[in-house]
From Swiss-Prot:
Organism listed in the record: Streptomyces coelicolor (strain ATCC BAA-471 / A3(2) / M145)
Cited Gene3D superfamilies: Dimeric alpha+beta barrel
One Pfam family linked to the record: Cyclase_polyket
Family matches, as SUPFAM superfamilies: Dimeric alpha+beta barrel
Protein name as catalogued: Uncharacterized protein SCO5314
Superkingdom, natural source: Bacteria
GO biological process, one term: polyketide biosynthetic process
């Protein structure tokens, strides 16, 4: 299982609106095109947005290819009032919002 963590800023009180955008999008074809198995959205502290994507493979290349897809553009446009780049000076595209995992541990099956 691959985990991708997207980090951004979110407007105060926007969690229900953001969740609605994704609930509607997740009922369409976009999660299947990207390869999303599970999505979790988190808010941390004063306006930090965390978006965890769980998938079989790294979704970054597919997300990069789908930025022009009508459903991807629609989600992005609907999120604009609520979500913004964590660091606007360095953001050029979706990959720039993806955190780099530097440690992972998994329990081995007992046996």
């Amino acid at each position: 299982m691959h985990h991708t963590l997207i980090v951004a800023r979110m407007a105060p009180g926007a969690a229900p609106d953001i969740a609605k955008v994704f609930a509607e999008s997740d009922s369409g074809e976009l999660p299947h095109l990207v390869g999303v198995n599970r999505r979790s959205l988190f808010e941390f502290g004063d306006g930090v947005y965390l978006h965890l994507i769980e998938s079989d493979e790294d979704p970054a290349p597919t997300i990069g290819r789908l930025t022009g897809h009508p459903e991807f553009r629609q989600v992005s446009e609907r999120l604009e009032p609520y979500v913004s780049a964590y660091d606007p000076a360095t953001w050029r595209g979706p990959k720039d919002a993806m955190a780099r995992c530097f440690y992972r541990w998994e329990r081995t099956p007992a046996g």
